[in-house]
Amino acid sequence: MAKSRFEYVREYEVHDTLLPETYIVVRIDGKHFHEFSQHYSFEKPNDERALKLMNASAKNVVMAYSGDIILAFGESDEYSFILRKDSTLFRRRRDKLSTLFVSLFTAQYVALWPKFFPEQPLSHKRLPFFDSRCVCYPNTTVVKDYLCWRYVDTHINNLYNTVFWNLVLKCNLTPREAEQRLSGTLSSDKQEILFSECGVNYNNESEMFKKGSLINRKGEIMHIDVVKQIDELFAGF
């Protein structure tokens, strides 16, 4: 390949290679999705179509790199992709992995949008975009705990949001009043408020809302108790 006298500038490029023999987690997260969801009138506390769009986008990412991805887990506007310890995808370069996953996910999200929101075309003034990060976890124990953390976070956030929005939408509290009503409450308190004051049994809520979405390397989307099945999920990895 012909070279020019300007090619020396490549020497300033820095390629950060992630640690070998560690699990890589690439987590993508929606940016300004509060405003985005308001603009497209997402249902509160959960919009089933929006979550299924996230799942479909993530599934296509998993299938594109099923040889490297063990599992993916999603809640709300975020998704985590867990790569094998021995993955050599893009020679484990942090910049390549981070930009690849977030750009592929975003492309899938935009391409699949009409399937889930056929009556609401995306506006060029309000497009979805995400950030991403890569984190290395040294062993199976730690990466299992990472997945359990995201699963438990799903439950905590969803329970709060479910009660909060039912207090606002069904009980006519202001957002400030709902926030004060829930201040200092435990999980059991929130479920009791939801049932006694809003007439909603949390146990009857969608499993996808309560447990998030797990995608295996076959592309199967599951809504399961990750903590109870964590060892089974990582069998062989």
From Swiss-Prot:
Belongs to the tRNA(His) guanylyltransferase family. GO terms for molecular function: GTP binding; identical protein binding; magnesium ion binding; tRNA guanylyltransferase activity. Adds a GMP to the 5'-end of tRNA(His) after transcription and RNase P cleavage. The lineage of its organism: Eukaryota, Fungi, Dikarya, Ascomycota, Saccharomycotina. It catalyses: a 5'-end ribonucleotide-tRNA(His) + GTP + ATP + H2O = a 5'-end phospho-guanosine-ribonucleotide-tRNA(His) + AMP + 2 diphosphate + H(+). Keywords: GTP-binding, Magnesium, Metal-binding, Nucleotide-binding, Nucleotidyltransferase, Transferase, tRNA processing. It comes from the Eukaryota. This is tRNA(His) guanylyltransferase.
